[in-house]
């Protein structure tokens, strides 16, 4: 028996999928160890669309900054993991990787947090 082909729906356009990711840099920006505008510029230069960095696909990917939050909006498939990769690359470039980490605080956002160094362990060692 021959496989039955389903007729393709003609004229049916796909709904544009808009992806929106936020990066919350509140803590390091308030402490003055990081500049949100500099980070935004870094993302604009480094995000690749169709294998090309810097052009953001002619408006397909947009980056907006409001105080210390950066929002990346994309109309093409865009990975949240790629945003984390670029953030870590920025932190390494600015020698902040030893103090800050990138943590997902929701399905569509990342947050820069300080490493929590356990001070309780140090106190226990001093007591012994």
UniProtKB/Swiss-Prot annotation:
Entry superkingdom: Eukaryota
A cellular component annotation (GO) from this entry: cytoplasm
Gene Ontology BP, a term: cytoplasmic translation
Transcription among keywords: no
Compartments, as annotated in UniProt: Cytoplasm
One Pfam match: Ribosomal_L22e
InterPro entries xref list: Ribosomal_eL22 (IPR002671), Ribosomal_eL22_sf (IPR038526)
Alphabetically ordered keywords of this record: Cytoplasm, Ribonucleoprotein, Ribosomal protein
Gene3D superfamilies reported in the protein's UniProt record: 3.30.1360.210
Subunit structure: Component of the large ribosomal subunit.
Family of this protein: Belongs to the eukaryotic ribosomal protein eL22 family.
Job description of the protein: Component of the large ribosomal subunit. The ribosome is a large ribonucleoprotein complex responsible for the synthesis of proteins in the cell.
Descriptive protein name: Large ribosomal subunit protein eL22
Protein source organism: Gallus gallus (Chicken)
Gene name for this UniProt entry: RPL22
